[in-house]
Regions:
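Acidic, low-complexity intrinsically disordered segments
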Residues: 1-145
Length: 145
């Protein structure tokens, strides 16, 4: 069973489709998913320290910049976690994010790629391996969160 932490840095308390939708997809695979909006909730250090996959939703430039200290924090807490960033600004900042230690960067319709990443990590059992599926543009079916 994969423990997944999804983080939003810029929702400011609004419902985040960028967390809710992938949560529904990932829970269908049996993953244990915890979501956090760090603008309204305390960062879950205990879960981050044991998560297999930690992923940041980056829908805009500000969210990307705000994610940086949390990426560094997770690297310090859990060097074994696979770090991922997804969303419109993730792929625009691929070089910057991978320079910070992010292993997977997803753009476009990211839900199915997150599911593929979890399957890849379950199969490989090596969270340090990069996973680079590219940008998914196909139309995806909506999952009810």
């Amino acid at each position: 069973m994969m423990n997944v932490l999804l983080i939003s840095t810029y929702e400011m308390g609004r419902q985040s489709f960028g967390l809710a939708s992938p949560t529904a997809w990932l829970r269908e695979t049996g993953a244990v998913v915890t979501c956090v909006d760090v603008t309204r909730q305390e960062f879950p250090e205990a879960f981050a320290a044991t998560a297999d996959l930690v992923a940041w939703y980056l829908p805009m430039h500000t969210a990307t910049r705000l994610a940086v200290p949390f990426i560094q924090k997770v690297k310090a807490l859990n060097s074994q976690a696979h770090l991922c960033c997804y969303g419109l600004y993730a792929t625009l900042n691929t070089d910057y994010l991978t320079g910070l230690g992010v292993k997977t960067v997803l753009g476009g319709e990211f839900e199915s790629d997150l599911v593929s990443l979890v399957a890849h990590l379950n199969d490989k059992k090596d969270a340090s391996l990069p996973h680079t599926p590219g940008t998914q543009l196909s139309r995806l079916d909506f999952r009810v969160p």
